[in-house]
Amino acid sequence: MFNFFKKGLAKTLENIVGVKGENKKITKDLLEEILLEADVSYEIVEEIIYYLPPQNEVKKEDLKRVMGSYFLYEKKETNQEKPFVELILGVNGAGKTTSIAKLAYLYKNQNQKVILGACDTFRAGAIEQLKLWAQKVDVDIVLTAQGYDPSAVAFDTISKAKAKDFDRVIIDTAGRLQNQKNLAHELEKIVRISNKALEGAPHRKILVLDGTQGNAGILQAKAFNELVKLDGVIITKLDGTAKGGALFSIARELELPIFYVGVGEQMTDLQEFNANAYLDTLLDPIFK
């Protein structure tokens, strides 16, 4: 897990080392500079420094304790329902479809039977793209033609999962319609119809966020959270950014857990988020 985050945060760590320079002693002023360079928001940097002990020199264990408090949001358990239904949301280009494929791969490797629902019937090519991923990962998929009612696809997917004893249902959704009102209506309908197919479904509503956007992705996430009450987020493309510190803002501003992080193109490059490993990766070069 440590090496996984090291790969994902390589650019962020490079910036941290650059700001730290030859300094062995980490003062609060230097820490502020380092954290801002890693795209931790100014407000959170000030908060972190405020909650540290009063002395000017910063100790790793104190900093880790304070920073760890941002990742305490409770994750919904995934082993209570069968099939367990997850609704995946996100704008086009955030890595939503590839994240769905990687999630399916992850679950399949945990000996779970997975089925995908191609409910992005709006974007040209979205159904075909998900179909290709389903073939690559070797999982089932329910799909229709472009323009078909996405809530009907969700209903059919969940119904098949119940009938055929699937463990996991992963439902793709449209990232963009002509306007927000249409998207809100569509997502609300998918949630309502999913619950008709299986009481309590969808069990988790997860937003996929592009890690290269840093703090800018928070506004996007808030908009989705208003449309559909989210349960957590997946952060993608962490390996392509020096903004690894934005995870603090995402967790705090949204008051949501980070479920998974993606750090590359390989199927194994999506892993469950581990706050302890993330903090160690971030802090080790500061206190080297």
Language-model segments: residues:
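P-loop/Walker A NTP-binding module and the surrounding RecA-like catalytic core of P-loop NTPases
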Residues: 76-288
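Non-catalytic terminal/linker segments enriched in charged/polar, low-complexity residues
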Residues: 1-88, 103-105, 109-118, 136, ...
